[in-house]
């Protein structure tokens, strides 16, 4: 089972504050483990303010200021000082992984001055930190019914308001959230 380009949707029984009602986009999953970004846990800073705080210098004018008002996300509890940009594939950056035709993840800083400009991917999210699982750990959590899984949908990532992403993902699975038990092992 390879869950790259899937969502992990936290079951109501999930109590870890990093993942409670969380939706994780799985960027990579293989025999060595898994890596993903929580896409619905905002922190109290906008992308634009973050860029100002880290003193990103721009050579191009900002032509999409609305994209800079979105919240930076807490991508997970691992390396919370490390940034990740999940975006539509566009441009060549020093450290990018093209996941599929709709999504890439970039960890190099060369993307930052372009955010909000005509050279940036039109749609993107910025996360600090990531969710990581060692070999077999995610599979164990799945066996314990900690997560529901579904194929990822870029519309949920880029078009759905942050606070509606969990409900939207559950609804797309055809499940009424009220019918999900908060106890593990029960429907």
Curated annotation (Swiss-Prot):
Gene3D superfamilies: VC0467-like, VC0467-like domains. Pfam families: DUF179. One of its GO terms (cellular component) is cytosol. InterPro entries: AlgH-like. Coiled coil: none annotated. Belongs to the UPF0301 (AlgH) family. This is UPF0301 protein PBPRA3139. It comes from Photobacterium profundum (strain SS9).
């Amino acid at each position: 089972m390879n869950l790259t380009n899937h969502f992990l949707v936290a079951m109501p029984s999930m109590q870890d504050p990093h993942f409670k009602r969380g939706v994780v986009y799985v960027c990579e999953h293989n025999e060595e483990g898994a890596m993903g970004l929580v896409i619905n846990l905002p922190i109290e800073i906008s992308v634009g303010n973050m860029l100002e705080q880290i003193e990103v210098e721009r050579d191009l004018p900002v032509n999409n200021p609305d994209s800079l008002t979105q919240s930076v996300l807490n991508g997970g509890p691992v390396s919370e000082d490390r940034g990740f940009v999940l975006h539509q594939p566009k441009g060549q950056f020093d450290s990018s992984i093209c996941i599929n035709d709709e999504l890439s993840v970039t960890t190099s800083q060369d993307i930052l001055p372009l955010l909000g400009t005509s050279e940036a991917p039109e749609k993107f999210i910025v996360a600090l930190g990531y969710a990581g699982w060692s070999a077999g750990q995610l599979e164990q959590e799945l066996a314990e019914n900690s997560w529901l899984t579904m194929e990822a949908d870029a519309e949920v990532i880029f078009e759905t308001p942050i606070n509606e992403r969990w409900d939207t993902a559950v609804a797309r699975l055809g499940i009424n959230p009220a019918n999900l038990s908060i106890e593990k092992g029960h429907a």
